[in-house]
Amino acid sequence: MADLLPWWKRAFGRALSIVPKGDFATDEKVRLFRKMVGREKSGVHEEIPPGGDLIEILYTGGTTKSPKGVPINGALFLTQCKYAMESMRPLLTPEENVFMCGVPLFHILGQTLGLGLILSGGTLVLHPRPNLDAIFTCIERFHAKAMIGVPALYRMILEHRRIDQYNLGSVKCWMAAGDALPVEVEKRFRDKFGRTIFQAYGTTETGGGVCMCPVDDENPPPKSIGRCLPGKEIRIVDPITLESVQDGVAGELLVSSKFMVTSYLNKPEETQNAFIDLNGRKWYRTGDIVSRDERGNLFFVDRTVDTIKHKGYRISSSEVESTLQEHPAVIGACVVGVPDRIVGERIKAFVVLKEDVKGITGYDLIRWCRERLTPYKVPQYIEFRDMLPKSKVGKLLKRDLRDEELKRREAT
């Protein structure tokens, strides 16, 4: 993207080693991005190659375990870009779209949506850091039509003190991905802006989007992460037997596609566990527990590694987090299981309060949960934090908090 800078900025940047330099081959197969943008052609659709050479190795976020290299081929990438743009077409054509990208380009979401938009002739506005005033200013300046960000970004927008000073009415399509969107955030956003936040779901291993709420439906079911996108096939199975479950029953999500990733880089054990053969077809085990209704809407329940085992019950940490985040004093929450030799795991919540809130105690939040959750789902411990550990794209790093608790207990 440094090629888009004015010539004098590129020159100074390279002289000061701020702008990266690199060598590349110069033949008929190499296209300079700056010249491609300058052509201003529209309606050009290259055929997707039947196979696909490796074009990049993208690393997972490492929210549950250490990051893993995912080899992505060109056919998968182009297919994902195509369907990502088609998913917004009921509201916007790619050519007229001005897209605010609130996720980085080293993330699969930023690549397939951001670069997919450029390949379709749209306009992409990048924000390396979540500076809300800069984002709002760009929305006004460029009359942005769409924006995507993690759920934490939408909570920050709602809490921003100067939000009423900006006109964000040009945005027709607000999208959230990367984590579960709390119901109270979606409701507050709809009440304030009169717009729906459309949820989407995908992984690095699937090359991006797997499902998305249809943008021509202003009232998607609460907590829905959408319907399966073209080019993808899904199965919801029992995590133990791998037998398909009925609609309405929660199970592990499996994903398959024509040009799918089939292995991790130099990780044979992880590859064997994640990529499996069923009925002669390769499937990726997402490790995410979802359910599906009779209309094909998918609902995120939890990650298998984040399910808390307490007194024989399997408890969704996401459900407890969502309940805590509905409290008017809470801006963020992360729930983990703490090992206990008697009950298996006890429920501990790490909570961040809003800046101007005082006088809220752990007992207040436990009482709040007791009024809204069944007794065995109520946290036993509440710990207040100034912030929660997050990845560079805003995902909660529950692994870090679990490791903290293990070290704390080993030290006692």
Positions of predicted regions on the chain:
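Conserved pre-ATP/AMP-binding loop-to-beta segment of ANL
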Residues: 5, 9-14, 19-59, 66, ...
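Conserved AMP-binding/adenylation subdomain of ANL enzymes
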Residues: 78-98, 106-146, 160
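Conserved AMP-binding
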Residues: 102-107, 179
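Gly/Ser/Thr-rich phosphate-binding loop
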Residues: 119, 144-149, 158-220, 233
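AMP-binding/adenylate-forming catalytic core of the ANL superfamily
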Residues: 140, 147, 234, 257, ...
